[in-house]
Amino acid sequence: MSIRSNFVRLLKKQVSIIKLQKKCSHSVAVIGAPFSKGQKRRGVEHGPAAIRSAGLIERLSNLGCNVCDFGDLHFSKVPNDELYNSIVKHPRTVGLACKVLAEEVSKAVGAGHTCVTLGGDHSLAFGSITGHAQQCPDLCVIWVDAHADINTPLTTPSGNLHGQPVSFLLRELQDKVPPIPGFSWAKPCLSKSDIVYIGLRDLDPAEQFILKNYNISYYSMRHIDCMGIKKVMEKTFDQLLGRRDRPIHLSFDIDAFDPALAPATGTPVIGGLTYREGVYITEEIHNTGMLSAVDLVEVNPVLAATSEEVKATANLAVDVIASCFGQTREGAHTRADTIIDVLPTPSTSYESDNEEQVRI
């Protein structure tokens, strides 16, 4: 990296720090999305409750955030929701759920909140990103996941819509996505250069073809092993924020982590992110000062073998979200107004009683 590049990066970081100092108190909207019809496994609808029970609201409040908990959305199951093309499951139900979520996220972002959506399965990201884009059309997306979720309704091997949301979001893929029931309201809101994947390690053949043929940026676990997570984040920001600052939407699937850390999820894949890598991603996103919305999805308490596995996965989800809003690994810092900025000085009498003094 050249001296000029280092200088520009340092300057941008200083500008971001100034932005964060000016906005020391985030206004955060938390929206629960207890939805499971984008996949086949029971239990992911309990994800929002598990994450809340792990202390999310208290953690954000302790970080100085002004938290507005919007509660959980209600999603209706559409009767007679038949398969599309003999394979795509629950298209009308998923389409309606995404529409409901899009409206709620749009309201929250429009009211000035940074929006946190608790899933629920990853099909919901079509709704959250669409709603975000209604208020911030120039947004960019960082998609942290073991899977690319970019199959189309014509390439999906499973028929599960949680493996397809990105194909609905990208303008370049619209001639490949048929008009399926339940999605007549939907419009693509991203270009391929607006999204970067991190943590991929389980791609279907069609997904691999799409990523390479359309030149969509991604960093697999092999890339992370070879380059290191620091370099991955630098390249991610160079692409998404290199020319201008713009809102970031982070869509984080808990299965991006190794199953040893996040066992309570529906599609675990061995060889995932470490705790340090995952939290470094969110810490760096926070440091840009540009985070505008977060999805945390696919926590499934029912699939855990023990209550300890539920607790570990939910606690990890809370750490991911909290580090998006300033939680650091440098100590338990809380509200900015409680941070000590002047060290106490020993009194004269105290000093006289002690022959050996160590001065700071």
Swiss-Prot record:
Q: In which pathway does it act?
A: Nitrogen metabolism; urea cycle; L-ornithine and urea from L-arginine: step 1/1
Question: Record-annotated residues binding Mn(2+) 1?
Answer: 122, 145, 149, 253
Q: In which tissues is it expressed?
A: Expressed at differing tadpole stages in tail, intestine, hindlimb and trunk region. Strongest in tadpole tail.
The record describes how the cofactor is bound as:
Binds 2 manganese ions per subunit.
Q: What EC number(s) is this enzyme filed under?
A: 3.5.3.1
What organism does the record attribute this protein to? Xenopus laevis (African clawed frog)
**Alphabetized UniProt keyword annotations:** Arginine metabolism, Hydrolase, Manganese, Metal-binding, Urea cycle
Q: Which PANTHER family does this UniProt record tie to the protein?
A: ARGINASE (PTHR43782), ARGINASE-2, MITOCHONDRIAL (PTHR43782:SF4)
Matches recorded under NCBIfam families: rocF_arginase (TIGR01229)
Q: Which reaction does it catalyse?
A: L-arginine + H2O = urea + L-ornithine
Q: Which domain of life is it from?
A: Eukaryota
Cofactor(s), by name: Mn(2+)
What PROSITE patterns does the entry give? ARGINASE_1, ARGINASE_2
**Gene Ontology BP term (one):** urea cycle
Q: Which Gene3D superfamilies match?
A: Ureohydrolase domain
Q: Which gene encodes it?
A: arg2-b
> What residues does Mn(2+) 2 bind to?
145, 147, 253, 255
The record's note on quaternary structure and interaction partners says: Homotrimer.
* Name of protein: Arginase, non-hepatic 2
The record's function comment reads: As well as its role in the urea cycle, may be involved in tissue remodeling.
Entry binding sites for substrate: 147-151, 158-160, 204, 267, 298
Q: Does the keyword Protease apply?
A: no
Q: Name one GO molecular function term.
A: arginase activity
